[in-house]
Amino acid sequence: AAFAGLTADARVLIRKARVEAQSYRLTVEDNPSVEYMARFIARQQQKHTVRGGVRPYGITCVIAGLANDGTPELWQSDPSGNYSAWRATTTGRNQKATREYLEKNYPADGEEPLTREQSIKLAITALCEVVDSSSKSIEVSVLEKGKEIAVLSDEAVEAVCKTIEAE
């Protein structure tokens, strides 16, 4: 999960989501779906929006994962409790510009899907539209079927940034 907003709120929601995922796994003896976790997080956010005496969570969450068949899923929830599925999305400062870039450059349904390298390059290029194009301001995590989540090294990100700048 990634988030934009108040870090303390994110920690609380992530802790609640982890407990819920563990409870689900013990009860059902299977991993919860990405949608289930997105719905759980959105429900927690919505409860704090309508309940008196507590302030709303001040974060937007982006939840990524793999379905049981290995297909990638991407969900986003906002402080009001709305959640929705995306093929590619952004959150935080300059969200509009990066989302517009992704909408223009992400393949439409039915088109050839992006390779791992193409996906990384597209994500970094979208970020370079709004931030300094260096490895110090960009962090990339890669989620692949059958593998652990990988965080790209600064050198790998810097190499992609240099390729983008050269184009």
Regions found by a protein language model. Give the residues of each.
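Long, low-complexity N-terminal extensions
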Residues: A1-E167
